[in-house]
């Protein structure tokens, strides 16, 4: 019974082995695959695993294969183009050394070149700080100009244009925002950040100061266009129009015209150039307020004088201004003239009082006004002045001034540039103005248009600089609607005879100084007697004497009866025909020879 049951359950004979397929009815299942992954005795893997590894190795080799010939040729072409562009940039840079200065700018921002700035020639970019002065020779492209830093020993290089500086500023601001975002995310778990979030408090920030700071940074352009040569303006020791100040300033002007003969233009400015603020002349709504106010000069007259100063500076000669209305450096701080402020300083108020009293009763009755003006100048920080002349002796003061101006002359006339012929430049400037009467407009605003064009541009040989004013939104050669029509046609350089013949009250716009002419250009009031061209006007003033007292005596001989003119400044050139103001010689004996400070 037992055997029968066992025989019925087992279909195979007892002597036959049981095949392994009975326990694994699906030989292609997951167990067989796992079996294939086992290593053999020699350490190698199964056949299907080995074949897969061969496929993976082949795909990895495809990434590390050598570049194709097309990639190599493309890279070589790029390198060749880069070298060719760099060679052309160097050639253009070399040619620009002998080209005239197209215009000058004063920087409001600093720039330090970095490798990522895409300079046309690496290592030839100009580094500058805020309030530096740059002479621009020409435009290289929309991103770069060619020019030099006005400093002795500096050569021409590439200067970023306002467009380039704005793009660099935007990139820097974007990086700062990203850094702040990353730092704020990483600091979210800090106790201070959590405390701010939970309590809902914010760190106190004065909103008014933040708005003012934002406004000041938004509206400041990178460059201000200034005259190619900074004009020299004398202030102090007191108010202009009074004899003590006029006498001491005249002594310095006489020294300048003899020391820098052929290199300086001295001109008188009667208009109130302190009105030439960018905020006023760029805002038409303020024009009506200025015109309605009881000001000495109209805006049209002020603008005409500014243009004349820019035109004088084009020749790269020194320019000295006898500005009637300028008695304090703050009057010109917001204009684009960027003058060299020379402060004639009298340290002791007692010395100034004695000098004023020595001029007679007509000056003594204005003693308090002059003393107050002197004290106001003395309160200014030294940074507001470029030169402070506090020497006792006239000769020492003159040498101090000459040393500064000689250094400035070397900074503006590098040895690499061809020395220009001022007489030839002035003659050609006359022809250039006649050919194109509309001056190039100012980069910074619509009012400082000097007609600043290279000689090649005036003759049509080189026109690459035509586009540079448009980069800041002002088309070249055009004035805004607020500019009086026909103003540019009145700006012209006159010959010596034209200057003398035009010696009339309305000839300020064309009063130029010619080479070799030691007399400055002055306008004659009809009530003042003979003009510059009159033989009765006398010869040129004598050369600089040894002390301030000697200059005072010369000043007395040349002083005419100007009391009818109020506070207008006395002339530089000697004039006869007018009565000489008397003074008490005994009152001057207390003023020692050459001692005017202590």
From Swiss-Prot:
<feature type="modified residue" description="Phosphoserine">
    <location>
        <position position="73"/>
    </location>
</feature>
<dbReference type="InterPro" id="IPR027417">
    <property type="entry name" value="P-loop_NTPase"/>
</dbReference>
<comment type="function">
    <text>Regulatory subunit of L-type calcium channels. Regulates the activity of L-type calcium channels that contain CACNA1A as pore-forming subunit. Regulates the activity of L-type calcium channels that contain CACNA1C as pore-forming subunit and increases the presence of the channel complex at the cell membrane. Required for functional expression L-type calcium channels that contain CACNA1D as pore-forming subunit. Regulates the activity of L-type calcium channels that contain CACNA1B as pore-forming subunit.</text>
</comment>
<dbReference type="InterPro" id="IPR005443">
    <property type="entry name" value="VDCC_L_b1su"/>
</dbReference>
<dbReference type="InterPro" id="IPR008145">
    <property type="entry name" value="GK/Ca_channel_bsu"/>
</dbReference>
<dbReference type="GO" id="GO:0070588">
    <property type="term" value="P:calcium ion transmembrane transport"/>
</dbReference>
<feature type="compositionally biased region" description="Polar residues">
    <location>
        <begin position="54"/>
        <end position="71"/>
    </location>
</feature>
<dbReference type="GO" id="GO:0045202">
    <property type="term" value="C:synapse"/>
</dbReference>
<keyword id="KW-1003">Cell membrane</keyword>
<feature type="compositionally biased region" description="Low complexity">
    <location>
        <begin position="181"/>
        <end position="196"/>
    </location>
</feature>
<keyword id="KW-0851">Voltage-gated channel</keyword>
<keyword id="KW-0407">Ion channel</keyword>
<feature type="region of interest" description="Disordered">
    <location>
        <begin position="1"/>
        <end position="76"/>
    </location>
</feature>
<dbReference type="InterPro" id="IPR001452">
    <property type="entry name" value="SH3_domain"/>
</dbReference>
<dbReference type="GO" id="GO:0007268">
    <property type="term" value="P:chemical synaptic transmission"/>
</dbReference>
<dbReference type="InterPro" id="IPR000584">
    <property type="entry name" value="VDCC_L_bsu"/>
</dbReference>
<comment type="similarity">
    <text>Belongs to the calcium channel beta subunit family.</text>
</comment>
<dbReference type="InterPro" id="IPR036028">
    <property type="entry name" value="SH3-like_dom_sf"/>
</dbReference>
<feature type="modified residue" description="Phosphothreonine">
    <location>
        <position position="499"/>
    </location>
</feature>
<keyword id="KW-0406">Ion transport</keyword>
<keyword id="KW-0597">Phosphoprotein</keyword>
<dbReference type="GO" id="GO:1904646">
    <property type="term" value="P:cellular response to amyloid-beta"/>
</dbReference>
<keyword id="KW-0106">Calcium</keyword>
<feature type="region of interest" description="Disordered">
    <location>
        <begin position="466"/>
        <end position="490"/>
    </location>
</feature>
<dbReference type="GO" id="GO:0030315">
    <property type="term" value="C:T-tubule"/>
</dbReference>
<dbReference type="GO" id="GO:1902514">
    <property type="term" value="P:regulation of calcium ion transmembrane transport via high voltage-gated calcium channel"/>
</dbReference>
<dbReference type="GO" id="GO:0045933">
    <property type="term" value="P:positive regulation of muscle contraction"/>
</dbReference>
<feature type="modified residue" description="Phosphoserine">
    <location>
        <position position="186"/>
    </location>
</feature>
<feature type="compositionally biased region" description="Acidic residues">
    <location>
        <begin position="548"/>
        <end position="559"/>
    </location>
</feature>
<feature type="modified residue" description="Phosphoserine">
    <location>
        <position position="44"/>
    </location>
</feature>
<dbReference type="GO" id="GO:0006816">
    <property type="term" value="P:calcium ion transport"/>
</dbReference>
<feature type="compositionally biased region" description="Low complexity">
    <location>
        <begin position="43"/>
        <end position="53"/>
    </location>
</feature>
<dbReference type="Pfam" id="PF00625">
    <property type="entry name" value="Guanylate_kin"/>
</dbReference>
<feature type="domain" description="SH3">
    <location>
        <begin position="100"/>
        <end position="169"/>
    </location>
</feature>
<dbReference type="GO" id="GO:0005245">
    <property type="term" value="F:voltage-gated calcium channel activity"/>
</dbReference>
<keyword id="KW-0107">Calcium channel</keyword>
<dbReference type="Pfam" id="PF12052">
    <property type="entry name" value="VGCC_beta4Aa_N"/>
</dbReference>
<feature type="region of interest" description="Disordered">
    <location>
        <begin position="179"/>
        <end position="223"/>
    </location>
</feature>
<dbReference type="GO" id="GO:0008331">
    <property type="term" value="F:high voltage-gated calcium channel activity"/>
</dbReference>
<comment type="subunit">
    <text>Regulatory subunit of L-type calcium channels that consist of a pore-forming alpha subunit and auxiliary beta, gamma and delta subunits. Interacts with CACNA1A, CACNA1B, CACNA1C and CACNA1S. Component of a calcium channel complex consisting of a pore-forming alpha subunit (CACNA1S) and the ancillary subunits CACNB1 or CACNB2, CACNG1 and CACNA2D1. Identified in a complex with CACNA1C. Identified in a complex with the L-type calcium channel subunits CACNA1C, CACNA2D1, CACNB1 and one of the gamma subunits (CACNG4, CACNG6, CACNG7, or CACNG8).</text>
</comment>
<keyword id="KW-0472">Membrane</keyword>
<dbReference type="GO" id="GO:1990454">
    <property type="term" value="C:L-type voltage-gated calcium channel complex"/>
</dbReference>
